[in-house]
Amino acid sequence: MQHHHQGSYGGGGGGGGYPGQAYREQNPYGYGQQSPQQGYGAPQQHNGYNQPPSGYGQPQHNGGQMYGQRQQGMWLRVRIASRDRKFLTFALGQYQNHYSHPHQGGPPPPPSEPVAFGHGAPQGYNFQYSRCTGKRKALMIGINYFGQKGQLRGCINDVKNMSTYLNQNFGYAREDMVLLTDDQQNPMSQPTKANILRAMHWLVKDAQPNDSLFFHYSGHGGQTPDLDGDEEDGYDEVIYPVDFRQAGHIVDDEMHRIMVQPLRPGVRLTAIFDSCHSGSALDLPYIYSTQGILKEPNLAKEAGQGLLGVVSAYARGDMGSMVSTAVGFLKRAAKGDEAYERTKQTKTSPADVIMWSGSKDSQTSQDAQIAGQATGAMSWAFISALRKNPQQSYVQLLNSIRDELATKYTQKPQLSCSHPLDTNLLYVM
């Protein structure tokens, strides 16, 4: 197991003022019960499933401007200033997804219409960006492992800093945040495996298009041999609850099953992992560099019967069947190249899932001693970059985060997504 925080803990804290009670009131499963491990389906709200959310208007810009829009592989969308504001789309032989200022107002907002996955995906398999104008919920986990071998110093600070930032700058209400840290007296607020899994279910329950969900983990991360054959490096990424010695770790496949697969189109889940081996902690298949260059699955090559079953369930609006089909398909997969090539397709999502991770899978996360507090380097850099400029595109923000880290660290955070991402769009949350 890797360690990623050193230094002195500069915050103390007894969890005062954090919404343990609000969480229990909203918890659909009831604290103290076993978290539901079987038959976890998606919200049963299918009306208008394939329709864009109401009030989801066109981007309101003035003047002519161009911005990159990935659609069906290599395309560029050109905004034409005209009375009826039509869009014209031109095919290009090659599209370089580097940022150029589209207009004086900054990067354009996400599009309102569903977007095709492209790259060989079956027809009708679309995803939907979220405009993050709906309900906000956040789950934040910080574990210092007090009294254990490998005790950390900064993880609770990470959670307190992030929760304050989200509350003051992004409209996340305290009563809609759940903080699990191992300095709290309430046993339901301890970051045990059972509490973490239960809180993950709470986070995504009843999420609607344009809602904005936020997940933050700061603690030990590691790798374990991959039993499904779906990881390129042969290892699953894991996180370690405070009681991992008794209850065990939580594998990336399980986090993906709980927090990504049930989400409807247009729901945003933003995840930040400040831990070792967190580069693919949510098993998201699309990965971006600072130039916006994309690592993506070839859906044409990999669209086997398993994916088609998932897509047909998706087209019917049958999210429960989609989840069970995907999980069953993963369990049936054989080890080796075939398993990896086939299963990463089921890790796509019609929702809008974005992950900022503090290290690539092959790296070990670093720590920082910032303003007298031991703090996770990724958490600190994310907040610092957005404070300096809240109006950035995805690729600008990724570069800004790396610039923040470059003064002290060799760590290179990465941006992962559940769908093809136009990294020139405005980052919203």
From Swiss-Prot:
Keyword Protein transport in annotation: no
Biased composition (Low complexity): 20-45
Uppermost EC category: hydrolase
Ranges of Polar residues composition bias in the record: 46-62
Cellular component GO terms held in the UniProt record: cytoplasm
Transmembrane intervals: none
Gly residues composition-biased segments: 8-19
Name of the gene encoding the protein in the UniProt record: casA
Name used for this protein in its record: Metacaspase-1A
Family statement: Belongs to the peptidase C14B family.
